[in-house]
Amino acid sequence: MSTLKNTFFIAPPETPTQAGPDNIFYDFNNGARVLLPEGKWHVRLLDADSDNILFCCDVDKGWVTSSKKYFVRFRIQVFRQGEETPLLDETLKLKDRPVLISFPTGTLGDLLGWFPYAERFQALHKCQLECTMAQDIIDLLAPQYPQIQFSTP
């Protein structure tokens, strides 16, 4: 899996963070990501809000990742090929979960323009939001947003 290099953003973990059945690993960091062991698999990535299938494939081993890297309430389904019931069926649920929004450092206008949407995202999804940004911007915003955790990258 290629990693993000020379970027202002924090790269996702090298391996998906959630362990599923039969040594399947998945997460929703940087889109939907699934790492499959040797086997005969059928994978579906869906938009959980519209129930539209965004991607579907058969794979023997390796990675399946979404092309969409922005927020989509993904649903991941992994089947053994030929079976109708998914072995793994997970939908992104953010309530009470830690969520990191990584803002680039060295910018002010864009960050101030986008930050109200981060606050709205937290209110909508009821998540534990942490935002990374430059310390001088943290000093400006943190007193106004006590419900958000701030940190430097």
Locations of the language-model features?
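Catalytic machinery of carbohydrate-active enzymes
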Residues: M1-P153
